[in-house]
Design a protein with these regions (language model features):
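Metal-cofactor-dependent catalytic cores
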Residues: 1-186
């Protein structure tokens, strides 16, 4: 039986979110994996670090501004997903890991992504702003070749974020809310 895939709205309603719930206002998060894909249908490549460029994206990624498929798509700067969600989804699918197949750039641990929605935060020394929660898309199912991935990631497929400052993001970097963005930019 094939998986029923329906088009998803541009922005997922917050009340449908099935990702990590905030357990305390003092969570401590970090980057556990980094991925880019040079082209839309190519496999994600695991990296130990990646250059983030404000208003452009991650160097080497398919959505890096000025690449053929990122023109006029400012909401495609970077994607984040919770490692805790990936572990649950992998267990549901009966596989060891789906981090690379999730097609997300930054895999986080200890970060309730819903806390970053419409807020500024830092990954290492790179400032970002959470733009929207999102759903898996039919392209993910096609490229991942993993039956059931759409359902496993439904309502918990991650966060799109805009990159606000240049810098290098590394595996192991901390992730924190930007307490006072005005002070950081002064």
């Amino acid at each position: 039986m094939t998986e029923a895939i329906r088009p998803m709205p541009e922005e997922m309603p917050v009340e449908l979110w099935r990702g990590v719930k905030p357990s305390s206002p003092a969570w401590q998060g970090r980057v556990v994996s980094l991925f880019v894909a040079p082209k839309s249908a190519e496999e994600m490549v695991s990296l130990s670090n990646v250059r983030a460029m404000a208003d452009r994206g991650l160097e080497g990624d398919r959505f890096f501004r000025d690449s053929w498929n990122a023109i006029n798509r400012s909401d495609k700067a970077v994607s984040l997903i919770e490692d805790e969600v990936l572990e649950l989804a992998a267990a549901e699918l009966g596989v060891e890991s789906i981090a690379q197949k999730s097609r997300r750039n930054i895999v986080t641990r200890g970060v309730p992504l819903i806390d970053l929605l419409h807020r500024e935060f830092v990954v290492g020394n790179v400032r970002m702003r959470g733009i929207r929660l999102f759903e898996p898309c039919p392209h993910l199912v096609k490229v991942s070749k993993l039956p059931g991935i759409f359902k496993a990631l439904n309502h918990r497929s991650g966060l799109k974020a805009a990159i606000l400052s240049d810098g290098i993001i590394r595996v192991g970097d901390s992730i924190a809310l930007q307490v006072n963005p005005a002070v950081a930019t002064a």
